[in-house]
Amino acid sequence: MTRALRNIAIIAHVDHGKTTLVDQLLRQSGTFRENQQMVERVMDSNDIEKERGITILAKNCAVEYEGTHINIVDTPGHADFGGEVERVLSMVDSVLLLVDAVEGPMPQTRFVTKKALALGLKPIVVVNKIDRPGARIDWVINQTFDLFDKLGATDEQLDFPIVYASGLNGYASLTPEARDGDMRPLFEAVLEHVPVRPADPDAPLQLQITSLDFSTYVGRIGVGRITRGRIKPGQPVVMRFGPDGEVLSRKINQVLSFTGLERVQVESAEAGDIVLINGIEDVGIGATICAVDTPEALPMITVDEPTLTMNFLVNSSPLAGREGKFVTSRQIRDRLMKELNHNVALRVRDTGDETVFEVSGRGELHLTILVENMRREGYELAVSRPRVVLQEVDGVKHEPFELLTVDVEDEHQGGVMEELGRRKGEMLDMASDGRGRTRLEYKISARGLIGFQSEFLTLTRGTGLMSHIFDSYAPVKDGSVFERRNGVLISQDDGAAVAYALWKLQDRGRMFVKPGDALYEGMIIGIHSRDNDLVVNPIKGKQLTNVRASGTDEAVRLVPPIQMSLEYAVEFIDDDELVEVTPQSIRLRKRFLKEHERRRASRETE
């Protein structure tokens, strides 16, 4: 008897409540014991995901509901992790599209939804947070319908079932008025509307690996859905990368399946199930595991190419090695190679210089999260400004363009449009919701977006929503898309910052440092109020004499320094600057620390 199975993926924009909803599904299906300690937001398993509330790695969990095993796969909402999305969707038969009852569908959901509709998956729409003040449910459903229509959905896909829910309060309903209850209507909708893909458990084994995991105990772990046949621990199999790949003989060590959030060893698994296997050291994404006598491989999975490149350098500042455990080029190289094991959309290239690595990824977030992870693990390194990856088509250089959607209050619309015009953005659509907010859609080059996030938050006083998604490659736009308007303040000496000196420098610009911070020659300590760089002395104390002052001393009043996040730092720097990243600090510096070296370098580039 084949077991009752359903495989679904959840699509949601950042912060629309996907992970909270999954918590409720796990709780109410009885997957957690009554006395078990529940962690909030179960699916976001690493620290960065919990802090920022974004999902980076596609994760799986499973619930049992009335005898049916439901595999739930989380998809990353961010286009930067598009490499993950496409593979995940190949494992499921339907998608739950989760939209916020106030914000409606956002561009990051658009990316995943487009991929899902193209694969012919039927969506179930879940309107979440229906108890929020300001919920506009009809508008949200109309927006969702229009989005599906724009993305080329079939009539069958446009006839989608709708479930109204509040993940936080743990209820779902088929009517928007409900304010209590449980998740049963959502489970019922899944059982009713998710198709069961026909699969033959008695045919020869075929299993395609769609994502990888790594464990220090058993090595590489492959995750995938069994297309047909059965698999058990200790079984001899063959592995092929695509129909033309070499036939490699291998042996399965363990087979694991998902139950709740746990991975449980099973004696055998059959067609339709999503499983983890280990014991094959060289398993890779897209590999097909087949029965020994019928080595029929499935076509390889394609992953989007990287659009941004950054250089990772060994930290060479005077303060290098004081805070980090891993500082050498070999240690950084080993860590990057380890990352390639499961981060499929990443590329690492050696340059001629052994202290510099060229790392390419799907976007700024993709790369800065890698840097943030390394920093937390005790690495020290320096990173350069991101550059876009150009492609040559018929002798013409093409650069990546993105679709940008911003949602702003009407009063900030002018400033945002002016800034996007300066960055050579092309407006595609503009719609007001009649409640004082306007949604703008632009097509803009990835170069033009570098550094836009922090500028945008300033322009909208933190009230704007923005997100962007890779669209296509197109011929390079002429001229520089964006130059930083201000110069920087550069320290001329090594030492600790002195309050009196910083106070005297306040008229010259905003500071990044506070009194007592360790500084060195060539380090950037603030933003200059004009457009040129200025070398200053922030470690000079007040000259004291033995003549008594007739009045009182002037009181030193300092403006608080700008708090720098890694994203802000990476967006802020220019081509001749680097971000120094250590476990405790983020500092900005010039590539050449000495003034005469900088002058020589700028003469050579002219």
Question: For the regions a protein language model found, what residue spans apply to each?
Answer:
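Conserved P-loop NTPase nucleotide-binding/switch module
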Residues: 85-99, 104-148
